[in-house]
């Protein structure tokens, strides 16, 4: 599915790229700074020099680890061995905080000069050992990146809209400020703390699709993959949620709107608006297609955003039988901007006239609600907000604090075939044929 969407000219970005160095290692470096204040000047000078060298090495190797993980996630099998090497190094760096704390506590909790000297020596040797490991693995990382042809270009892609990107960035930054303000107010309150959720940006009016598995076609030797319409009209909102252990945590809520020009039975309890919540941490890949026809959505010629959702990270002890289980964890959703049909609007007006006063009151309420709620139908703006909030969630820091290279990973298009002028009718027909014969 990933390959077909890429060949169909969809812009693509992989989100399964966590920051190479954990937040814990940053705190460990601060712990060393506090540690050197409590020890003799000669020892402090040596450890401070080692700390500076380690900090610079970690910053350099972090970018390389990010790039290796990104290229490997895109399907480069040549980097799998290097990925295992970097994984071991990253785990050692992640444990750095815990080990440094254990060693420094011996100095703080002991008055014995011998114990303090042993702790100082242990910290010094441990930092030297970690530096040696980084220096040993660096040539292999460089060689792997050179032979793979990968690069971490920080230039923005040509198809990126600067205006919409700035708008999305403003929405995310504004949400950061509102969230911090709400958290402070919540902390001042008495009793149980409320679960906070603060909306990011506007409400988007969308149409939601998901994959329908055609069992009849599967029995005939084909998967017959088909996109089915789940919600003709829906409201999509992105929220930042306070959670234990995570400063930045987001989810997208999609709520069906029955005011879609279709018949719905008000008295039928089973016929109620649907809701869908998607944890942004579960979005592993995002595709942006300039035309819904590439997905065999005949009535959707407008842009479509495709989300690959993988919930397997929530399962700690995954069985090795695994391939089927892993596939079951993957869900595909497609979102396009909702397009109102004029005929439906005219029919609604006629029905309101027939219903008289009740209809007018309901219409006035809907108009008032629309005025109060900031709405947008730009799928591209929604895409940029998802990219930026996913970056904050993965790195656990503000987009204003991340490096250009990290920002580039989440904004660049990894698909070289995504130019709009390359998409022809033959491309659409070829994609439709592949989707029809796709086996999942």
Swiss-Prot record:
Give every RanBD1 domain span: 1-314
Q: List modified residues, type Phosphothreonine.
A: 272
Bias class Acidic residues marks the residues at 341-371
Task: Name one process (GO BP) from the record.
Answer: protein transport
| Listed GO CC annotations | cytoplasm; nucleus
User: What else does UniProt say about it?
Assistant: Present with 3670 molecules/cell in log phase SD medium.
Role this protein plays: Important for the export of protein containing nuclear export signal (NES) out of the nucleus. Stimulates the GTPase activity of GSP1.
Protein name in the entry: Ran-specific GTPase-activating protein 30
Q: Which organism is it from?
A: Saccharomyces cerevisiae (strain ATCC 204508 / S288c)
């Amino acid at each position: 599915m990933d390959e077909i969407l890429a060949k169909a000219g969809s812009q693509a970005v992989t989100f399964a790229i966590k920051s190479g160095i954990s937040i814990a290692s940053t705190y460990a470096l601060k712990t060393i700074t506090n540690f050197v204040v409590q020890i003799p000047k000669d020892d402090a000078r040596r450890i401070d020099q080692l700390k500076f060298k380690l900090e610079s090495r970690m910053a350099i190797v972090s970018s390389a680890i990010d790039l290796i993980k990104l290229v490997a996630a895109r399907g480069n099998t040549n980097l799998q061995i290097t990925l295992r090497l970097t994984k071991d190094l990253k785990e050692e760096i992640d444990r750095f905080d815990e080990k440094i704390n254990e060693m420094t506590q011996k100095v703080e909790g002991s008055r014995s000069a011998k114990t303090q000297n042993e702790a100082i020596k242990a910290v010094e040797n441990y930092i030297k050992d970690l530096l040696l490991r980084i220096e040993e693995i660096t040539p292999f990382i460089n060689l792997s990146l050179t032979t793979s042809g990968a690069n971490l270009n920080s230039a923005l892609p040509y198809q990126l809209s600067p205006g919409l990107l700035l708008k999305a960035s403003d929405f995310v930054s504004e949400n950061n400020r509102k969230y911090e303000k709400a958290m402070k107010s919540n902390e001042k309150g008495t009793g149980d703390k409320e679960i906070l959720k603060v909306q990011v940006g506007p409400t988007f009016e969308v149409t939601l699709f998901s994959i329908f598995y055609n069992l009849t076609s599967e029995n005939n030797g084909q998967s017959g993959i088909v996109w089915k319409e789940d919600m003709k009209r829906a409201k999509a909102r992105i929220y930042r949620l306070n959670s234990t252990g995570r400063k930045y945590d987001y989810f997208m809520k999609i709520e069906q709107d029955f005011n879609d020009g279709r018949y719905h039975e008000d008295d039928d309890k089973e016929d109620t608006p649907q809701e869908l919540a998607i944890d942004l941490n579960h979005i592993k890949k995002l595709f942006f297609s300039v035309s819904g026809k590439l997905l065999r959505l005949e009535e959707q010629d407008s842009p479509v955003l495709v989300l690959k959702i993988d919930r397997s990270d929530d399962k700690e002890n995954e069985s090795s039988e695994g391939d089927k289980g892993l596939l079951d964890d993957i869900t595909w959703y497609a979102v396009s901007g909702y397009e109102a049909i004029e005929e439906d609007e005219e029919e609604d007006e006629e029905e309101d006239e027939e219903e008289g006063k009740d209809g007018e009151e309901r219409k006035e309420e809907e108009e008032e609600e629309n005025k109060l709620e900031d709405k947008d139908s730009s799928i591209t703006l929604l895409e940029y907000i998802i990219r930026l909030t996913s970056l904050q969630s993965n790195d656990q820091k503000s987009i204003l604090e991340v490096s250009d290279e990290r920002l580039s990973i989440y904004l660049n298009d990894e698909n070289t075939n995504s130019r709009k002028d390359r998409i022809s009718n033959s491309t659409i027909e070829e994609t439709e044929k592949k989707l029809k014969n796709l086996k999942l």
